[in-house]
Amino acid sequence: MRNRILIALAVILLLAGLGVLLYPTYKTAAVREQERQEIAAFEEYRATATAPTAESNPVALTDEPSETVAPSETETAERIFPELWEACVAFNEQLPGTQRTAYSADSLRRPSIKASDYGWEQEAFGYISIPAAEIEAPLYLGANSANMNKGGAILGQTSMPIGGKSTNCVIAGHRTWSGAIQFKGLEKLQVGDEVRLTNPWETLTYHVIETKIVLPDTVDEIMVQEGRDLLTVFTCTSPNTRRYMVICEREIEEGASKTWNWILLPWVASPLR
């Protein structure tokens, strides 16, 4: 009888140990599936949206791209949600002159634009894909707790994720959350690795130019850099005392050739945790 009890206890302890070991794997798989579903819903939503005609909305069609917006990788003049696009462009244009004075911890949590005011009804505003880090996560406007628990969060008072000259879209993500691995893979990235940013209109391709560990209360590096098209992604370190940051840049077109601006930047962390 005693031996049976000991065997039963051993089996229970073994199963409990296996559960503890396997839970992060299970939780990560569940979170990844939820993120895939959110991305699929985003793609279906924008695929079924209809671009307005020139007669119904002349603003939607342009012969030349805005100077503040990088050339479209889809090379299309017609855009769905043209008023939302124009709002994003306008916000990015005025940001360099107001970003530092408008900065506060609270401003980072608020969306820079309320997309629903322009007819956008999806929660996600896009998604980020980083093959080398095994990351593909939906993106939400405003780096508040609710958004960060669901995927990547675009900091308020940083550029809207449409690219262009003098922009710096800054994305925060949990390293892990409730046992699931989220943005921990950022630590795998090396200079030159590809990062793809998909917004409601197109997919923009960036490449890593630097990685660095920084203090959480520095703010300079989330600021726009004049003339540059930047994407900054960060997560917390373990333990949660620093921020691991990855800065990326889009190609700069010069005539028929494409060159890289490999200037290394100073870095900053958001106070968000």
Model regions: which residues?
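Solvent-exposed, non-transmembrane regions of membrane-associated and secreted proteins
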Residues: I7-R273
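Positively charged n-region of N-terminal signal peptides that target proteins for export
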Residues: M1-R4
